[in-house]
């Protein structure tokens, strides 16, 4: 679809009481503005223009960082003077040279709008019969929204703001303005300069385009959302939480319909870019943030948070934090495991209780069951790491690597001082400090020999008591 989406994201958002741009606040781990950009891309818009103003550098980072490699052109245009929504659209048109085709103008704080809604909305002006359509909705509580009054011909007669509604209008006019507009690009470009600023705020308001277009004999109509939630916006932290709950419910219901079990759908927070395989069970307080893929027949949670992580099938992820990790099939993580960026758990491996792994590959069937830190390590298959063992990978300036061969056994409370090399089938005695390579099938022993002194403890206690009597 050769349509342009203009997303208005220049506002201050003062009611959020934040040091950050309103539309940068996250819903299920994703900034609001990215929800809307994604919806326009999925709807088939060929170009997306985000109008920024307040916190411009922050907004550029959010957009450029996420869409630098997008097949759809996504760009930021700065509105240096915030002179209203009409002015913002004019800035976008002039900067991008938009003169034709459907132009969809969306507020940047509508994270629930769907691609299907955007596509249908843009299509209303694609034939040229309508110069503009206004997105409307019928929320359960219309208080605070501008009300739509239609004429006998089905066109918009006027939009009556809440403060201007009579009691009768408030009771009978239940269709509300969602604040989004679709324009015939040629008509918009031809008449955008006719918007005036003769109002209390001396701003240029985009809704004034309705009367301007009608004055030129152009048809203006409405597009009613099938789901009123598509038109809900965020102006406060309370509304942010409310829309987060709606987004959570939508996503969880989708995955339940796809064959995923949720023990308590109100206590699982699945991001919009996550994918979950069938017959996986999601336990309470599970968070999937960013691009997360989970295979089939997994147990996720409770109390787990996965960010930009891939999980295979048949895995157990129990009270685990994983960030930018790859977890293959049949892997057991937790409880209370921490997989940091660069972790790669191969098939059948294990990261157990209070285990931290960073930038390491854990080989097929290898186990790190208890109280260990493994960093900058390549571990072969069939390795067992005893409780309390760590790789000492940092010398105060540089990180160094550890290599543990297949079928090696690392005894409990072992410190492997990197760069360290443990050969295939080697055994490292418990309590060792390993500073030299251990050859294949060798025993590595790096501790002092135990010495027993007969009677020493009894003599020690006797001397303590004598000192107490002095």
Short names for language-model regions:
Residues 9, 52, 107, 136-137:
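Short beta-strand/turn micro-motifs composed of small residues
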Residues 57, 113-200:
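Conserved core of the sugar-phosphate nucleotidyltransferase
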Residues 157-249, 253:
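Catalytic-core segments of class I nucleotidyltransferases/pyrophosphorylases
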Residues 19-36:
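Short catalytic helix/loop segments, enriched in acidic residues and glycine
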Residues 261-445, 450-451:
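Structural signal for interior beta-strand "rungs" in well-ordered beta-sheet cores
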Residues 4, 31-123, 127, 465-466:
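Conserved N-terminal catalytic core of the sugar/cofactor nucleotidyltransferase
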């Amino acid at each position: 679809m050769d349509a342009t989406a203009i997303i208005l994201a220049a506002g201050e958002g003062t009611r959020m009481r934040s040091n950050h741009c309103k539309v940068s606040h996250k819903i299920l781990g994703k900034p609001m503005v990215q929800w809307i950009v994604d919806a326009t891309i999925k709807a088939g818009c060929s170009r997306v223009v985000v109008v920024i103003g307040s916190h411009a550098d922050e907004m550029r980072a959010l957009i450029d960082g996420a869409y630098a490699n997008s097949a759809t052109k996504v760009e930021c245009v700065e509105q240096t003077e915030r002179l209203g929504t009409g002015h913002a659209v004019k800035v976008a048109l002039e900067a991008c040279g938009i003169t034709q085709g459907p132009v969809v103008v969306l507020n940047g704080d509508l994270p629930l709008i769907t691609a299907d809604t955007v596509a249908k909305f843009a299509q209303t002006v694609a034939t040229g019969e309508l110069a503009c359509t206004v997105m409307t909705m019928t929320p359960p509580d219309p208080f605070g929204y501008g009300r739509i009054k239609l004429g006998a011909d089905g066109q918009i007669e006027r939009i009556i703001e809440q403060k201007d509604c009579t009691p009768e209008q408030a009771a009978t006019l239940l269709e509300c303005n969602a604040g989004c507009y679709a324009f015939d690009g040629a008509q918009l470009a031809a008449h955008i300069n006719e918007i005036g600023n003769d109002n209390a705020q001396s701003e240029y308001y985009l809704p004034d385009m309705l009367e301007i277009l009608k004055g030129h004999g152009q048809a203006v109509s409405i597009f009613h959302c099938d789901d009123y939630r598509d038109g809900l916006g965020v102006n406060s932290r309370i509304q942010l939480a409310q829309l987060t709950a709606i987004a959570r419910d939508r996503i969880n219901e989708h995955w339940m319909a796809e064959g995923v079990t949720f023990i308590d759908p109100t206590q699982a927070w699945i991001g919009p870019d996550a994918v979950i395989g069938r017959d996986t069970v999601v336990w309470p307080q599970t968070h999937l943030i960013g691009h997360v893929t989970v295979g089939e027949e997994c147990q996720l949670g409770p109390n787990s948070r996965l960010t930009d992580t891939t999980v295979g099938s048949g895995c157990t992820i129990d009270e685990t934090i994983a960030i930018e990790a790859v977890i293959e099939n049949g892997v057991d993580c937790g409880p209370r495991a921490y997989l940091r960026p660069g972790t790669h758990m191969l098939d059948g491996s294990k990261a157990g209780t209070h285990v931290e792994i960073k930038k390491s590959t854990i080989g097929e069937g290898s186990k790190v069951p208890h109280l260990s830190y493994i960093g900058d390590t390549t571990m072969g298959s069939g390795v067992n790491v005893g409780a309390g063992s760590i790789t000492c990978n940092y010398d105060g300036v540089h990180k160094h690597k550890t290599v543990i061969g297949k079928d090696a056994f690392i005894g409990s409370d072992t410190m492997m001082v990197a760069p360290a090399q443990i050969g295939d089938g080697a055994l490292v005695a418990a309590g060792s400090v390993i500073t030299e390579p251990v050859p294949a099938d060798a025993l590595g022993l790096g501790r002092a020999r135990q010495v027993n002194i007969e009677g020493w403890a009894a003599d020690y206690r006797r001397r303590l008591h004598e000192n107490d009597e002095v």
